[in-house]
């Protein structure tokens, strides 16, 4: 028995699990999908089109493309293709019912034939890995005219759909979305350039005052993934700073997948940062009452853990720091570490000319790194306060991005339209769809388009 997560393309909140047997025909899977969604469509199950939700790969230009398996290429048999992670940008937009270029690319490919078994289609023809949790496996495309109820094709719903599309093109399309876990050098440099941020490495000095409290490196287990070792490495961190946590009423919380607590819009910019980090150091009230975690009470720092640290890892940590700084009231710090010989700290430092400076420094000894963390957590998080940290060349003065980022005004001819559409969505989210208001917004949009204003 295998559990597949399926998602209906174009329908918000339509991701659902289906239990099936890999030896069954794809046609049987279609019947199971229809049974799970009897109210969504009424057509024959055989008319559904199914597509594999493959994780994209980057081509030579860095663009995400759909991987294609060629059985004749021996090198392609060495590693299976991966399923689409549920935190990938395309997956997040998919479950929200939004369009995405990569989803379009997947559904433009070859649909799964109903006469084949899942085993044949998944593994023989496409060399996919075994399905697991936190993935999307099958994309479902419902044929036109197969909607469930008469209201699906009513004039009101068509009007709402048009407003949705205008909202997408006039508001959402102007926003650039960066997912922390998908950051790389190209995306990272674009983000830093857009925000006028420059990275400035600073040197370290010999540990003053004797020898730091010894700390062993974390022992990674080769037969387990990073995610499977999340709790052991959280306990490792707590064991090395537990006294300071207790004294300052703090805790270290491991952030679960899907809990995107570092999702935020950059003020004054059409930029959205999305996702999470691995661990957060914050007030211990978040441990007593886990439902407070999204509010990040008393947050002091984030810790991004990578078994192997790469350049992309650095840009991920920077993206997370920017998001946390925007969300948090006080100044914060980020740590990127493999928990062995790479302990890299990042903080918002100052402004130089028209650029915000984020400084970074790296330690290689766990004992020295934990001495820095203990000292940091013992100090006031107030922005602008200088903190002398072990092994740091000079006192650290952390600032807030909100005080340093240049303000950008959204002077645009479409701002009135955008405000009207956003206001419509705010009201609709509380009171439900309003036909008359939708008509008024649509009329305003039409009047703003020269070609259509003649008819309005």
Curated annotation (Swiss-Prot):
Keywords: Glycoprotein, Host nucleus, Secreted, Signal, Virulence
Chain residue ranges for the region called LQLFLAK domain: 18-54
Glycan-carrying positions: 338
Signal peptide: 1-17
UniProt motif HVLVXXP motif: location: 137-143
Induction / repression: Expressed during colonization of the host plant tomato by P.infestans.
Main location: secreted
InterPro entries for this protein: Crinkler_N
Highest taxon of the lineage: Eukaryota
Pfam family of the protein (one): Crinkler
Region: DWL domain, residue numbers: 55-136
GO biological process, one term: symbiont-mediated killing of host cell
Places the protein is found: Secreted; Host nucleus
Gene Ontology terms: cellular component: extracellular region; host cell nucleus
Function (record text): Secreted effector that effector that induces cell death when expressed in host plants. Induces the expression of defense response genes in tomato.
Similarity annotation: Belongs to the Crinkler effector family.
Domain notes: The CRN proteins have modular architectures that include a signal peptide, a conserved N-terminus, and highly diverse C-terminal domains. The conserved CRN N-terminus harbors a distinct LXLFLAK motif, which is followed by the conserved DWL domain. A highly conserved HVLVXXP motif marks the end of the CRN N-terminal domains and forms a junction where diverse C-terminal domains are fused. The conserved CRN N-terminus mediates the translocation into the plant host cells.
Protein name according to UniProt: Crinkler effector protein 2
Species of origin: Phytophthora infestans (Potato late blight agent)
